[in-house]
Design a protein with these regions (language model features):
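Ser/Thr-rich, low-complexity intrinsically disordered terminal regions
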Residues: 3-7, 17-168
Length: 168
């Protein structure tokens, strides 16, 4: 009984150390960026979601619809939303943003990428863990929470772009 308890404790300690090592490893990386103008496809692991590839049903999330006009403050609203959600901005190029999120306990880093497609009037999102296999649904939940927050801003952005009508 005592031996089993010691073995179980050693296995648990080894597992916790392994998680801290994975967390440290995830800090050495960056988002994949745009590949031929689109967000990268998700790897064959469950810890990634992306709105670019609807045929990849396992990883697919719906892109965020944006109005045809009223996108003047869209980029700043996206950045502010990411920061409000606890993300750190990593890169910004034109209509592309990359950010990272870190877990509190083990410091796992996830990449969060956004591509604004003004021609199709959508925002594409990709959220993926840098290491490991399972994320317990964290990336999907993050992408969905981001989508809800940005979607709630759309009516006010569209209204702010409509010029006030003055006297004749």
């Amino acid at each position: 009984m005592k031996t089993a308890l010691i073995i179980a404790s050693l296995l648990m300690a080894t597992f916790v150390i392994y998680l801290f090592i994975l967390g440290a490893m995830s800090r050495n990386g960056k988002a994949p960026g745009l590949i031929e103008g689109s967000l990268a496809r998700c790897p064959d692991k469950p810890n990634c979601v992306c709105s670019e590839y609807d045929k990849d049903t396992r990883h697919y999330i719906t892109p965020i619809a944006i109005p045809e006009r009223g996108t003047d403050h869209l980029l700043s609203n996206i950045k502010n939303t990411i920061i409000d959600m606890g993300g750190s901005m990593q890169a910004e190029t034109g209509q592309y943003l990359a950010a990272s999120f870190s877990s509190d306990l083990f410091g796992f880093v996830d990449d969060f990428e956004v591509r604004i497609d003004l021609s199709r009037h959508v925002i594409h999102v990709r959220s993926a863990s840098r290491v490991g296999t399972s994320d317990l649904g964290v990336n999907r939940k993050r992408a969905e929470a981001f989508s809800k927050r940005i979607s709630r801003m759309m009516p006010s952005m569209e209204q702010s772009s409509i010029a006030p009508s003055g006297p004749g």
